[in-house]
Amino acid sequence: MKKTILILLISLTGLATATYSQTGIYDAELAQKLKADEIGMKKYVMAFLYAGDRVAEYSKEERSEIQKGHMSNISRLADMGKLILAGPFFGNDSLRGIFIFDAASLEEAENLTNTDPAIKAGVLRMELKEWYGSAAVMMVPEVHARLQKPKN
């Protein structure tokens, strides 16, 4: 499953890069803002979220509170500009979700993940990998905010 996801992400990045380079519309200001290299790419840290070993130690109510804290932490990291993309996987697999961090190192990303209540509680665990992808991924939060309906 993880291999399939990585292949898909790499393919999409390559397709986006190839399509963009064919248009010939280079925006130096945007490239600098997004910290893109000469081919429009940058390094990220990708986190794979797995079910942790301590899930069974918590009641349904406790897990619900941990999940609320997890979601609040996601919002906090996104507001800081560190968490660029996050989302769950479908199904009941042990692989629960993914984060993409704008982090300079694995250590920085690990420090960010260690602020998550679900990680602290052992309900989730993270596997971190450096990933080289399109700098355009940095625009996901801005675009997503324009697509998400306001809460009532």
Go through the PLM ranges and name each one.
Residues Q22-N152:
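Conserved, structured core segments of small domains
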Residues M1-G24:
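Bacterial Sec-dependent N-terminal signal peptides
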